[in-house]
Amino acid sequence: MIYRVENKSVNQKLVNEIAEAYAYFKQYIERYKLVSNMSDDINNKKKKINTIEGVTYDLLDEDDFFIISNEVLKGKKGNWYLGYLSTSTYYRQRAKAYANFLSCLER
């Protein structure tokens, strides 16, 4: 998979915003799924969730999946990676994972 890491801070900001939107959409759907007049809005949010999950599960390699699934889908924050990766390896792999994730979402 080809990836570009020209601007790591922009990639990090975009992925963080996607993670926040993903968490919001999941909560929104759970909260309002029983209200019938909200069904179009819920379906739209479900499509966005499916896109994020589909990219994560289907298009990312194992290393990218590990980081994106933990930070975007599970919403882990802080030093969650310390039991798995060294800090320098994590930051290097995270930059690559973010770039690949954003690239896949653009497709």
Predicted feature residues:
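Short amphipathic alpha helix immediately N-terminal
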Residues: L59-G75
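Helix-turn-helix DNA-binding module
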Residues: K74-S88
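Short, conserved sequence motifs enriched in acidic/basic residues, glycine, and aromatics
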Residues: D58-L59, Y84
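N-terminal interaction/assembly modules
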Residues: M1-D58
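DNA major-groove recognition helices of helix-turn-helix
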Residues: Y90-L105
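Alpha-helical interaction segments
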Residues: N11-V15, N70, N79-L82
